[in-house]
């Protein structure tokens, strides 16, 4: 997979950088594995906006992805690599030997025709799913379960992988992409390898319209609003925030405030907290 840049024929193509989709082998999804999904547009069950700047975009069909990998001992062949509009990662369509079809997250370097399998005795190969107790130290894994049998919940974005650091008792220490080191039960399953399409981080939409196609609406700075709309609003000209620090539209501290509960029960499983992200690298903007 590679990325493709464009000559500045128009203002929209001047900064446009996209993936070339060379790894995608089929343009149509498997009909038995797609369902329609009502788009919430950032609203909850009462119609109140709970997530701003969402709405519009192209219509989508949701692909049913197998995050559990619970067909143990049944081999499957990779039939195709598909595009998924709901995530940056690609999907691998598996044809199992018993006739069932399933989607999984496509690992990096997986090819059509390759065979994958899940189970405690599966070979140590990319795309196979094993319990963490069977993973060699130093292995790169993705789609990691937090609780046995619940399905992969961590390390699922494009290009992400976690590293098996140590094994002790009933737990395995994983180094997550955020550099956090966390203990996970050894019975939890994970898939070997890293998630494919890692070049997505080097892409650029190029124009506001492409962001609208993805269902993202414009994000307006609070400092250019009226005082009735945002705590940062009002004043003559380019006025400062007027507070000790930036706040959300509802007056809560923003940009750097820790939101994790101090007495969360799962804190005992975190051996090392994730690194602090500086404002320069975060590239934050006015709320």
Swiss-Prot record:
Record flagged with keyword Ribosomal protein:
yes
A Gene Ontology molecular-function term? rRNA binding
- Gene Ontology cellular component list: large ribosomal subunit
Biased composition annotated in UniProt, kind: Basic residues: 258-287
Read off the SUPFAM superfamilies from this record: Nucleic acid-binding proteins, Translation proteins SH3-like domain
Region ranges (Disordered): 221-287
One GO process term, biological-process aspect: translation
rRNA-binding is among the record's keywords: yes
Instruction: State the superkingdom.
Output: Bacteria
Which terms are listed as keywords in the entry?
Ribonucleoprotein, Ribosomal protein, RNA-binding, rRNA-binding
Instruction: Briefly state the protein's biological role.
Output: One of the primary rRNA binding proteins. Required for association of the 30S and 50S subunits to form the 70S ribosome, for tRNA binding and peptide bond formation. It has been suggested to have peptidyltransferase activity; this is somewhat controversial. Makes several contacts with the 16S rRNA in the 70S ribosome.
Q: How does it assemble?
A: Part of the 50S ribosomal subunit. Forms a bridge to the 30S subunit in the 70S ribosome.
Which HAMAP family does this UniProt record tie to the protein? Ribosomal_uL2_B
NCBIfam families in the cross-refs: rplB_bact
Q: What family name appears in the similarity comment?
A: Belongs to the universal ribosomal protein uL2 family.
Q: Which named protein is this?
A: Large ribosomal subunit protein uL2
The gene designation is: rplB
